[in-house]
Amino acid sequence: MIPGEIKTDAGDLQLNVGCEQLTVTVANSGDRPIQVGSHYHFYEVNPALKFEREKCRGYRLDITSGTAVRFEPGQQRQVTLIAYRGKRRVFGFRASIQGDL
């Protein structure tokens, strides 16, 4: 085994199967790139990202763990989000929630 190597079963892996999904259009109104990580509470991302923020409360990006999406200045794109699961409690980030969703 090589350090950091991941061994998986043959075939394609499906991530987040059965999770509640939401697709939103996001635009970077700022003058610098903004990168959002896989588990960041999307509701609390940089205010320069413009989208239907209230609709995204309790959601994160539907991407592979440990990866991110980068929004260049002036760029607009659609992203798919998935709902947080488990106890649905959020702490940290921009400190907008600090508890139950």
Swiss-Prot record:
<dbReference type="GO" id="GO:0035550">
    <property type="term" value="C:urease complex"/>
</dbReference>
<dbReference type="InterPro" id="IPR050069">
    <property type="entry name" value="Urease_subunit"/>
</dbReference>
<comment type="pathway">
    <text>Nitrogen metabolism; urea degradation; CO(2) and NH(3) from urea (urease route): step 1/1.</text>
</comment>
<dbReference type="InterPro" id="IPR002019">
    <property type="entry name" value="Urease_beta-like"/>
</dbReference>
<keyword id="KW-0963">Cytoplasm</keyword>
<dbReference type="GO" id="GO:0043419">
    <property type="term" value="P:urea catabolic process"/>
</dbReference>
<dbReference type="Pfam" id="PF00699">
    <property type="entry name" value="Urease_beta"/>
</dbReference>
<protein>
    <recommendedName>
        <fullName>Urease subunit beta</fullName>
        <ecNumber>3.5.1.5</ecNumber>
    </recommendedName>
</protein>
<comment type="subunit">
    <text>Heterotrimer of UreA (gamma), UreB (beta) and UreC (alpha) subunits. Three heterotrimers associate to form the active enzyme.</text>
</comment>
<dbReference type="GO" id="GO:0009039">
    <property type="term" value="F:urease activity"/>
</dbReference>
<dbReference type="InterPro" id="IPR036461">
    <property type="entry name" value="Urease_betasu_sf"/>
</dbReference>
<keyword id="KW-0378">Hydrolase</keyword>
<comment type="similarity">
    <text>Belongs to the urease beta subunit family.</text>
</comment>
